[in-house]
């Protein structure tokens, strides 16, 4: 299966434009929830007060620039639905509590990796990824929807924005092309805590600088970040979370891969052209297949960097997920666990 629809997991069906029937269901649902909302008014008010008390002075109204235009958030939201990949972790890192979230890597439980385990006070309603259940989202009565790291599909955005103000992908952020830094900035602004966001960013950037300083051998080295699914091999292009991670450590993404980049975050690599994966270091992630399907493949083993022993194949799903998720929580985990794996073959 191709990775072009989903950067992390076997793709489901693409999102489709909402039908007239869906609009009718959503409209009826919103009206119904409004009519019977008296029993939860005190809870909602309390949540709003608690949320507002954490906002920074002068933070609202907040404006977030997106591909779909500037989105204005008038007051700090109390009921946030975090749909984009890593959006829920961004909210949690900033002290928020999403009422709904998408589980992009099928972690189960609260839908977050072990680096964010235990941060929810109350488990969120889990929402689909490529095809979010719009009725389920509307039933949560959100006052803000976050979808900063997704496909950037116009129909998806149009449907979500009918439910609540929606912060979609940034300009140039189609197909999951947004870094943890930009995602943190956007979410922090929407939640009214931009200074807290900048503090988290500064802390994370220091961790990158410290890791890079500890491994001067990374500087200037070329690296290929690839994956294999049931459909075949591929490699990630510059501008994605994975490449941002390694570039901050001093690596340079494989120029031969970047030369073939299109609109997607990823290029397919045929078996006849696996030498395209060659670099000073080749790092591979198995998706939906055992790691041995990569490491034992004779054509992969013939790639010069692999043959020379300068390769890493992730065989730990947690490490792979941390490297892929690209949130302030997961990159800290990855810096601790993944960087030593990169260093070993370059000694």
Where are the regions that the model predicts?
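Sec-dependent bacterial lipoprotein signal peptides
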Residues: 1-34
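Short, low-complexity, disordered segments immediately C-terminal to signal peptides
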Residues: 23-27, 36-61
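A short, structured surface patch at a secondary-structure boundary
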Residues: 87-136, 149
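Extracytoplasmic ligand-binding site segments that recognize negatively charged/polar headgroups
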Residues: 106-110, 153-155, 170-186, 220-245, ...
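Extracytoplasmic substrate-binding proteins
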Residues: 156, 162-229, 324-347
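Basic- and aromatic-lined ligand-binding clefts that recognize polyanionic substrates
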Residues: 79-91, 196-256
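Proline-aspartate-enriched helix->loop->beta-strand connector
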Residues: 141-147, 165, 274, 279-280
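Structured C-terminal subdomain patch of bacterial secreted/periplasmic proteins
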Residues: 277-347
């Amino acid at each position: 299966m191709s990775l072009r629809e989903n950067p992390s997991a076997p793709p489901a069906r693409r999102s489709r434009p909402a039908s007239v029937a869906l609009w009718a269901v959503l409209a009826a649902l919103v009206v119904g929830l409004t009519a019977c909302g008296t029993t939860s008014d005190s809870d909602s008010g309390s949540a709003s007060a608690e949320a507002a008390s954490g906002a920074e002075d002068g933070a609202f109204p907040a404006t977030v620039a997106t591909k779909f235009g500037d989105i204005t958030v008038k007051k700090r939201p109390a009921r946030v639905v975090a749909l984009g990949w890593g959006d829920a972790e961004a909210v949690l890192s900033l002290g928020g509590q999403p009422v709904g979230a998408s589980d992009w890597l099928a972690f189960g439980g609260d839908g977050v990796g072990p680096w964010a385990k235990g941060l929810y006070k109350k488990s969120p309603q889990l929402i689909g990824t490529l095809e979010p259940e719009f009725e389920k989202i509307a039933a949560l009565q959100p006052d803000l929807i976050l979808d900063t790291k997704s496909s950037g599909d116009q129909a998806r955005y149009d449907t979500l924005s009918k439910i609540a103000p929606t912060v979609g992908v940034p300009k140039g952020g189609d197909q999951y092309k947004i870094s943890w830094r930009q995602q943190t900035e956007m979410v922090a602004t929407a939640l009214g805590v931009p200074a807290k966001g900048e503090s988290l960013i500064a802390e994370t950037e220091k961790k990158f600088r410290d890791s890079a300083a500890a491994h001067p051998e990374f500087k200037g080295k070329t690296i290929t970040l690839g994956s294999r699914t049931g459909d075949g091999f591929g490699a990630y292009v510059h501008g994605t979370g994975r490449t941002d991670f390694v570039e901050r450590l001093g690596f340079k993404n494989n120029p031969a891969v970047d030369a073939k980049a299109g609109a997607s975050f990823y290029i397919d690599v045929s078996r006849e052209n696996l030498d395209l994966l060659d670099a000073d270091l080749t790092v591979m992630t198995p998706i939906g297949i055992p790691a041995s399907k990569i490491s034992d493949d004779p054509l992969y083993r013939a790639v010069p960097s692999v043959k020379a022993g300068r390769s890493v194949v992730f065989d730990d799903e947690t490490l792979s997920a941390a490297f892929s998720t690209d949130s302030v929580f997961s990159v800290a985990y990855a810096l601790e666990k993944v960087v030593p794996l990169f260093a070993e073959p370059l000694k």
